Amino acid sequence: TQAHNLVADNPEKLAELQRLWLIEAVKYNVVPLDDRGFERINPDIAGRPQLIRGNSQLLFSGMRVSENCILNMKNKSHQVTANVVVPEGGASGVIVTQGGQVGGWSLYVHDGKLKYCYNFFGIQYFITAADTPLPAGKHQVRMEFAYDGGGLAKGGTVTLYYDGNAVG
């Protein structure tokens, strides 16, 4: 049980596990341990990026984008901006997406061109595509949605950009 001190019976095992913990902690960059309490709450003091600031949100590669964990973009104008690096020979894949089979949106590159798809409950898919391929190199891509307004789910206009230039 937890009331029995296993360390007294197995000091070698304790030393082995302490050593293993330290090896793994170094391997996964968790040392030095940050034992600050209040300071860790403020990203600026803690030395990490602030993921949400005002009406902007910062996402990193591989982050899960759950509906209730990001800014609400429904029924309002908004934009999504991403910095990408396109290899020689082009790129293909998802840049950022939110939602799933029953609704959501995705900003992605397909056939070398930036595309945006809005999935309306699996009933209808609205796709906007760039007119030109995304060239090799570092680029900033952006999707702007201008909401038509006047109530819920009234639609709007999507414009795609490469490095500040409208492409679709």
Put a short name on every predicted segment:
Residues 5-90, 161:
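Long, internal low-complexity/basic segments
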Residues 57-71, 103-105, 120-130:
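Secreted extracellular polysaccharide-interacting domains
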Residues 69-80, 99, 130-138:
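Extracellular/lumenal carbohydrate-interaction signature centered on repeated Trp-anchored short motifs
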Residues 84-86, 118-120, 145-147:
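Short beta-strand segments enriched in hydrophobic/aromatic residues
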Residues 90-95, 153-156:
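Beta-strand acidic-aromatic groove motif in beta-rich domains, primarily in extracellular
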Residues 94-115:
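Glycan-recognition/cleft segments
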Residues 120-140, 147-148:
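Short, aromatic/His-centered strand-loop micro-motif at the edge of beta-sheets
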Residues 136-168:
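Carbohydrate-binding surfaces in secreted/extracellular proteins
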